Curated annotation (Swiss-Prot):
Protein name per the record: Dermonecrotic toxin LhSicTox-alphaIV2
Gene Ontology MF term list: lyase activity; metal ion binding; phosphoric diester hydrolase activity; toxin activity
Residues bound to Mg(2+): E25, D27, D85
Entry cofactors: Mg(2+)
Disulfide partners: C45-C51, C47-C192
The keyword Transferase is annotated on this UniProt entry: no
Cofactor note: Binds 1 Mg(2+) ion per subunit.
Gene source species: Loxosceles hirsuta
Lineage of source species: Eukaryota, Metazoa, Ecdysozoa, Arthropoda, Chelicerata
Length: 275
């Protein structure tokens, strides 16, 4: 999966998919009542990016729904996976549950069209703080209470704070997520700084072991050719990037052409890939 980074205005969906992304990452900020408010990153953000692009969440979700609904004039069939980078820093461990519940209701209304022919993308809830695991609990409750538990088949989970893998597993279990139940594990840092692949390799080992908790591993945020090759050599499943075309170019190189291909909608992002 080539995961376009910081896609926070609707027009950027086309921009990143045109460059080769089959997945996007969108930042979600919350108001004082734990309601998702804007798709917005703010400063600081990645080098060579403008940090202030934004939409109201409802506007963004409407655009995203159209981009992932077959038959819509804005439909992009390549776009199969969306990561919501949930900026829960202003929530507490007690309001995280409420935030999750409200976000679940909002996705149901605006993205899934009330459960009636809405967007088809798979969605990862990416949470920066292990203490906010109740966001997941609240989100799941919202869909169950609305009679749309079936939509949880489209939802995956990630903790993005580069925490200890054992602690991450514990937080997922506390949220009611079983091992390998739609679990993506991220690792990374802003593109302004280099970061080694030690934890990525640990996560890949966990993914490939008989008793791990991870289905997929992704690395963020890179666009240098050498970094992309190193990440692919570490056997990641996804790369988050500001320059999707760089990842496309590397995937077309002789060393990688036969080992990797771009994921399509038919590739289940919750299934661990076995070579």
């Amino acid at each position: 999966w080539i995961m376009g980074h910081m896609v926070n205005e609707v027009y950027q969906i086309d921009e990143f998919v045109d460059l080769g992304a089959n997945s996007i990452e969108t930042d979600i900020t919350f108001d004082d009542d734990a309601m998702a408010e804007y798709s917005y990153h703010g400063v600081p953000c990645d080098c060579k990016r403008w940090c202030h692009k934004w939409e109201y969440v409802n506007t963004f979700l409407d655009g995203l729904r159209r981009a992932t609904t077959p038959g819509d004039s804005k439909y992009r069939k390549e776009l199969s996976l969306v990561v919501f980078d949930l900026k829960t820093g202003d929530l507490s461990s007690s309001t995280a549950y409420k935030g999750g519940k409200l976000f679940g209701q909002k996705l149901l209304d605006r993205y899934w069209n009330g459960g009636n022919n809405g967007g088809r993308a798979y969605i990862i809830l990416s949470i920066p703080d292990l203490d906010h695991y109740a966001f997941i609990t609240g989100f799941k409750e919202a869909l169950k209470n609305a009679g749309h538990e079936e939509l949880l088949a489209k939802i995956g989970y990630d903790f993005s704070g580069n925490d200890d893998l054992g602690s991450t597993r514990t937080a997922l279990n506390k949220a009611g997520i079983k091992d390998r139940e739609h679990v993506w594990q991220s690792d990374g840092i802003t593109n302004c700084i280099g970061r080694g692949l030690g934890r990525v390799r640990d996560a890949v080992r966990n993914r490939d072991s008989s008793n791990g908790y991870i289905n997929k591993v992704y690395y963020w945020t890179i666009e240098k050719y050498v970094s992309v090759r190193d990440a692919l050599d570490a056997e990641v499943d996804g790369i988050m990037t500001n320059e999707p075309d760089v990842i496309v170019n590397v995937l077309n190189e002789g060393n990688y052409r036969g080992r990797f291909r771009l994921a399509t909608y038919d590739d289940n992002p919750w299934e661990t890939f076995k070579r």
